[in-house]
C-alpha cells in the first residue's frame, strides 16, 4: 500500500503481516535471458547467472568429461565462463550476433582482451546469429548461418532480465528493459 507506506504479505504459514516503511528498497534480482533458439532445452545446454547455475555446469563437466564448449554471448559473464573453462582445459568458442567484443568499451580497451582470448585459443565469432542447436547423441552443434560449431556443452550467457513483477503489481513505473524506474 504505497499511500499508507506499508508492505502487506503472507508468511509461509499463511498468516498475514503488515510492515510500515519510510523508504522501501525492492531488490528482487534478475533471471538469465533464455534465447528463443531451437535446441535450448537439449541436455548439455545451460544458461548461467548464479552459483547454482555454475554448480550444474560443473557437475555436467565432471560427468561428461567435456572437451569443447560454445558460449553464446561475449559479455562479462561469458568471459568469466570462458576463462574458467579454458583453465579446465576445454576448447571454447564464443558466438554473438553483433560485431565487436565488449562493444560498450572503447575499441582500444577491448583490443587486448580479444588478443588474450585469441592467444588462449578461444574462437571468436562475432556477427553470427545462432539459428538453432542440434544434438547427435551427446554431441551438440551450434548453427549460425553457414557456421556450425561442435560442442559437448553450450552456455547461453547473453544477459539478465529484471524480476520486476512485484513492483509492477504495486503500480510502480518500469523503465527500459523492464527494470524498476528510479528517481536517480
Regions found by a protein language model. Give the residues of each.
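A conserved short coil-to-beta-strand element within the FAD-binding core of flavoproteins
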Residues: 1-6, 126-138
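FAD-site-proximal beta/loop scaffold in flavoenzymes
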Residues: 41-65, 141, 148-184
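Glycine/small-residue-rich loop that forms an oxyanion/phosphate-binding "nest" at active or ligand-binding sites
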Residues: 2-12, 16-19, 28, 34-35
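Glycine/Thr-rich phosphate-binding loops of Rossmann-like dinucleotide-binding domains
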Residues: 34-35, 79-81, 151, 164-165
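Rossmann-like dinucleotide-binding cores of NAD(P)H-dependent redox enzymes
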Residues: 68-71, 76-132
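Short glycine-/small-residue-rich Rossmann-like dinucleotide-binding loops
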Residues: 11, 25, 29-30, 155, ...
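Residue-level detector of alpha-helix initiation sites
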Residues: 30-32, 52, 76, 100, ...
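Core beta-strand elements of the Rossmann-like FAD/NAD(P) dinucleotide-binding domain
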Residues: 14-23, 144-153
Amino acid at each position: 500500500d504505497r499511500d499508507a507506506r506499508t508492505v502487506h504479505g503472507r508468511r509461509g504459514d499463511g498468516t498475514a503481516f503488515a510492515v510500515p516503511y519510510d523508504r522501501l528498497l525492492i531488490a528482487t534480482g534478475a533471471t538469465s535471458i533464455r534465447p528463443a533458439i531451437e535446441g535450448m532445452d537439449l541436455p548439455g545446454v545451460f544458461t548461467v547467472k548464479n552459483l547454482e547455475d555454475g554448480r550444474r555446469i560443473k557437475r555436467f563437466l565432471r560427468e561428461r568429461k567435456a572437451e569443447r564448449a560454445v558460449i553464446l554471448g561475449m559479455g562479462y559473464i561469458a568471459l568469466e565462463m570462458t576463462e574458467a573453462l579454458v583453465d579446465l582445459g576445454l576448447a571454447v568458442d564464443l558466438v554473438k550476433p553483433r560485431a565487436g567484443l565488449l562493444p560498450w568499451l572503447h575499441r582500444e580497451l577491448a583490443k587486448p582482451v580479444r588478443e588474450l582470448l585469441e592467444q588462449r585459443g578461444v574462437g571468436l565469432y562475432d556477427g553470427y546469429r545462432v539459428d538453432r542447436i542440434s544434438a547427435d547423441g551427446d554431441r551438440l552443434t551450434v548453427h549460425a548461418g553457414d557456421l556450425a560449431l561442435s560442442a559437448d556443452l553450450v552456455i547461453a550467457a547473453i544477459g539478465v532480465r529484471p524480476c520486476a513483477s512485484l513492483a509492477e503489481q504495486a503500480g510502480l513505473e518500469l523503465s527500459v528493459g523492464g527494470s524498476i524506474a528510479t528517481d536517480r
